[in-house]
Amino acid sequence: RFVSAIGEELSHGEAAALSWEVYFVLRGLPAMGMDFDLGKYFKSDELNALWACEDLGHYLKRSASTLSTEPADVAVALLQDLISTADAAAEGKADATVQLRFGHAETLMPLLSLMHLRGCYYLTNYFDTVALHWRDFDIVPMAANLQMVLFKTAKGRVYVRFALNERAVPLMPDSDDTVIPWSVARNYLLR
């Protein structure tokens, strides 16, 4: 719709390139507080196709895939630091009761993939299905965050709860439990 509204004859490649450029500019306007309707320029199926292509790019660049685990592997040092910090807290050796780290989507996506959190880790050879199972806007919306909260019982047992974007998420692939013993979580994360 957008390209035909210009009124010029464009090759398929020119039309695709122009659509991408306009999409990349316009999609960011609402995040800047500008009230804007992308539907004015693109049909919903066109918008979905453009987003799915962008989503696939994020998936291939920042998550484990059947092509490479390298995007997730870059987060190994961060995960090891999270584990050692949690170990110190569990053993009562941490000076702080809260540890905060700040990063961007480009930091969180690899970490979440490495941790195999549900919805953040998806392997397939059918890349046209990625947008059905791995959605960047669910994984790292604006102000995305991962919480790892440790609890210690009166008997000294330590449990952990993970929350992604303020929602409790199970860590273990075969369980819906959102609070699990730290030792179980630790062993799983070190696999």
Description of each model-found segment:
Residues 1-99, 103-191:
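Signature for phosphate-centric chemistry
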